[in-house]
């Protein structure tokens, strides 16, 4: 299991979403919360699965064309308000061709041609990201070159959405398509197309536990270790 950096970890520092209160309730002090805030700055910005799947929280950046450029980003810092680091955390795929200004005020909206070109240049089959609520748990876009995976059912206890887990394992046992075959197909089609072999069968869908079945954990006394 590998945790990746996301943009809302700055909100945790600001004591949003209840993490600070949970630490105070369980451990009796803010020491655990402070330690977690320090750890967040060291989380990886992105991860690559078997050289085929790029995992990132948000999306792409107009300042990044290759995976090597992602590797050069200094990650031990708070997420900046602009630039490639910010874009990787905040950008979203959209039903457009290239780039557009994001209504979020940070990052960009990027289109089908952007995703196809990035995957083609970097030998990727898929970009897996989160960052946007998807009612069905996952959403394939850009000719199946990118997928949004949402793993929080009934988000904020009111959205009524299902969630999903992306299961990659079986496909990693099969060899990737040779680059020559990819280029041959691209030449016949005139532009990069989808090389993804991922589909609905790769996603495990689950729902929130019904309210009547929820079991609250017993409230244990605060551990002396963290006092």
Language model feature labels by segment:
Residues 48, 55, 148, 165-169:
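Short, well-ordered beta-strand micro-motif
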Residues 133-137, 145:
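Short amphipathic alpha-helical segments embedded in low-complexity Lys/Glu-rich regions
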Residues 40, 146-151:
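Conserved active-site segment immediately N-terminal to the catalytic lysine
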Residues 174-176, 180, 184, 188:
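Short linear motifs in low-complexity or flexible loops
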Residues 7, 40, 57, 131, ...:
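Divalent metal-coordination and catalytic microenvironments
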Residues 1-8, 12:
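Single conserved hydrophobic/aromatic residue that forms the stacking wall/gate
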Residues 13-31, 53-125, 136, 151-157, ...:
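Active-site-proximal loop/helix segment associated with metal-binding centers of metalloenzymes
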Residues 33-36, 41-47:
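Conserved N-terminal structural segment that caps and organizes enzyme catalytic cores in eukaryotes
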């Amino acid at each position: 299991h590998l945790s990746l950096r996301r943009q809302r970890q700055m909100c945790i520092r600001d004591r949003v979403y209840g993490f600070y209160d949970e630490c105070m309730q369980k451990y009796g002090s803010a020491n655990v919360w402070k330690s977690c805030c320090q750890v967040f700055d060291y989380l990886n910005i992105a991860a690559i699965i078997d050289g085929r799947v790029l995992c990132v929280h948000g999306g792409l950046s107009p300042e990044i064309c290759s995976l090597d450029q992602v590797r050069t980003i200094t990650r031990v810092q708070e997420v900046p308000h602009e630039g490639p680091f910010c874009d990787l955390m905040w950008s979203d795929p959209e039903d457009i061709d290239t780039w557009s200004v994001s209504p979020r005020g940070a990052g960009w909206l990027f289109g089908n041609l952007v995703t196809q070109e990035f995957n083609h240049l970097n030998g990727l089959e898929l970009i897996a990201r989160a960052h946007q609520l998807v009612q069905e748990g996952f959403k394939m876009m850009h000719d199946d070159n990118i997928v949004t995976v949402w793993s929080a059912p009934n988000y904020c206890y009111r959205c009524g959405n299902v969630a999903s887990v992306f299961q990659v394992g079986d496909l990693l046992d099969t060899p990737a398509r040779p680059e020559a075959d990819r280029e041959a197909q691209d030449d016949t089609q005139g532009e990069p197309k989808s090389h993804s072999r991922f589909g609905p069968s790769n996603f495990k869908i689950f729902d929130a536990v019904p309210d009547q079945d929820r079991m609250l954990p017993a409230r244990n006394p605060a551990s002396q270790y963290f006092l």
